[in-house]
Amino acid sequence: MRERLNYVKEATDGYRAMAALNRYVEGCGLEHSLLELVKMRASQINGCAYCLDMHSKDARALGESEQRLYALNAWRETPFFTERERAALALTEAATLIANGHIADELYAEV
């Protein structure tokens, strides 16, 4: 996949901030495989092909199955995801689409 913009080179401070946030999130106790699913789902919603390529490779390296990666866009209709994963994916969608509404209290309670 051809890179359109080298963020490390062209937006060094922004990239450093994003990398620091990523390190923080990775240290919060969620398993890395779940974090990759969350990153992939947000990337699907945002339509970021570069991010999808990167996160799908990372997910596969962590042992994620092709079946689950292919079904991620329709996670609600599949039996492939645990309740914990479903809660994380629902929160991811709500937070990524925050401009369309808000994150419901019921969703926070699930997480």
Where are these regions (language model features)?
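Short acidic alpha-helix initiation/capping motifs at coil-to-helix transition points
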Residues: T12-A17, G47-C51, A99-E106
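Mid-chain, well-packed structural core segment of small domains
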Residues: A71-V111
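Acidic, glycine/proline-rich low-complexity segments that act as flexible tails and inter-domain linkers
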Residues: M1-E36, D58-R60
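Short, thiol/selenol-centered motifs that function as redox-active sites or metal-ligating centers
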Residues: V38, A42-H55
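Beta-strand segments within the central parallel beta-sheet cores of soluble alpha/beta enzyme folds
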Residues: E36-K39, Q67-A74
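Iron-sulfur (Fe-S) cluster-binding segments and ferredoxin-like electron-carrier domains
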Residues: Y15-R16, L52-A71
